[in-house]
Amino acid sequence: MHGKNIFKEDFYLMTNQKKVLTGDERKRNSKRRYYTKKRAPKKAVSLPPVEQEKVRISFLGGMNEIGKNMTLYEYKSDMFIVDCGLAFPTAELPGVDLVIPDFTHVINNQERIRGVIVTHGHEDHIGGLAYLLKQVNIPVYATKLTIGLIKGKLEEHGLLNKVKLVEIKPRDNITLGSFNIELIHVNHSIPDAVGLAIRCPAGIIIQTGDFKIDTTPVDGDMIDLPRFAEYGKKGVLALLSDSTNAERPGCTMSEKNVGESFELLFRKAKNKRIIVATFASNIHRVQQIIDVANARGRKVAVIGRSLENLVKVGEELGYLIVPKNILIPI
């Protein structure tokens, strides 16, 4: 999503095993000393009251940037959050491991927050969740795989048994105060991704989440375009759409085409070792690598904490089919 972040006040650094910067670091002067070991004093974020019968959408992250996606919806006394991700620091932030959204407005209004819905399990959508849940106690709604990945994050922070996790699926409806939200299946580079149809007295808002239109997805489950069309016919107040690479001509290649390339490359390699670099969260790509390796009598070694965790969670939840004895240690 693109636009300007409305939260630009003070910034602070949290220390809890990792150095975490809160706020939009790209707006800072890199020559100024703003790293502290303790939380710096912050001005309270004061937004004007929402006009009667109107809905307010606030972007706490994910605007004009890749990372720390977080959107806040407000109607009268009810608020809810969509996603809570992290971003990785730029070169101007030495010593900082990750950047999370500014939670001040959420903390100041936590009694009005009805919950957080997570659209999918990428770091830029779930990576900041544990830091938020240390400060506010709200339920988390997400699909099966996304819940599995969130559990790993919460366990790392000692929060696993302290947070209410609610598993949901496409076409489910959730009521959060004045809002009723329907989940709509979308294709992405990770399974179980959803878009949202958000209904409130002010109108219908569509938030697509991250998506691509893949007519031949690996799992055979294509984006639910008919459901989006139905909402279009009803009339939509606002569309919040993923726009990554929207300025590039053409369309995104189907993941199945990537699998065909693997078969060709494996044949060319013959008995040589093959090293494949991939995003850890791309389960469908990992599945295709495993399938081709198994068909050609090869073993697969997984390197990297994130990838190892995803393979473990994906196999446990049935999103990855791993033949017996194909995985080997390094």
Label each region the model flagged.
Residues 1-49:
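Intrinsically disordered, low-complexity RNA-associated tracts
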Residues 33-117, 122-330:
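His/Asp/Glu-rich metal-coordinating catalytic cores
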